[in-house]
Amino acid sequence: MNWTLRLIAYCTFLVFIAGCSSGGTSTAEGPNVVEVTARGLTLEAPDSIASGWTTFQLKNESDMTHFAVLERMPEGIGVVEQQEVVAPVFQEGMNLLNEGDVDSAMAAFGKLPPWFGEIVFMGGPGLIAPGRTAEATLYLEPGTYVLECYVKTNGVFHSYNPSPDGYGMVHEITVTADSSGAPAPTSTMDLTISSERGIEVGGDVEPGEHTIAVHFEDQVVHEHFIGHDVHLVRLQDDTAIEELAAWMDWTQPTGLQTPAPAEFVGGTNEMPAGETAYFTVDLEPGNYAWIAEVPDPVGKGMLVEFTVPAAGESAGSESGD
């Protein structure tokens, strides 16, 4: 059994034994808007927000590409445990993968606590280039959540801080029982992602501001421990699609390693099957791709190129598989 299959088997084991299917208090900017700022290798965000439909605005004020995945933690578990017993394990395993020692990396990943399989990834703003803002809307139940960015620089996950005096690029948020009362957004485009058919988008894409509904038809554990998601990337004439596709696999030494090979403009991180997330983006004329952060997105049908035409022109799209 190769190492990627062993990764799948181990993560699936964690999920099944868990029985899982899926500094000071501050407040949010508004009843349903949460401002998150990526500054350096930190995520700044409120400590407590209301439940219900919530829009996260990730402002990237750093010089690196980031994202902010929202993870619902098991009861009694928070950012302290995540930083003490999860982040170091992943970094240890990544160090070994960087050295080409797959067997030892697998042994390192085996140190993950059983409750790791109980973490539920609930979306959040997708990959976003420096100087840009990503906006994603999702429905949150009360509980303890951790925002995380695990993009890498020099082989080190942003969510891991080698200094014992500080945390990595993570932030704990308590979602209270008080409802935001906000309605679900109204979409201008609909996109479906599944492990069977990849990314599917209906209709032509027109320029302008869009609210894109991302429907997670299913969810599976891929070779890199986690599920599929949807990001939007703007392509240039010199963008190497093979390099971009390979970059989406964090288990590779160059995967999710800064600088990014293209300009990301938003999206949504992974969610359980049956969930819907929304993200807002202003589409200027040009070439783009929908892409998932999974190993071999082309082979999975999770890299789809398309063109946003200038006003009055016809749109075009093509699958990346």
Where are the model-predicted features located?
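Residue-level signal for mature regions of secreted extracellular proteins and peptides
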Residues: 13-14, 142
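C-terminal motif of bacterial Sec signal peptides marking the signal peptidase cleavage site
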Residues: 16-19
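Bacterial signal peptide processing site
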Residues: 21-23
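Short amphipathic beta-strand segments in non-cytosolic proteins
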Residues: 232, 256-264
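Extracellular/periplasmic metallocenter environments
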Residues: 35-71, 110-199, 203-207, 212-225, ...
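Bacterial N-terminal signal peptides that target proteins for export
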Residues: 1-9
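N-terminal low-complexity, Pro/Thr/Ser-rich intrinsically disordered segments
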Residues: 26-38
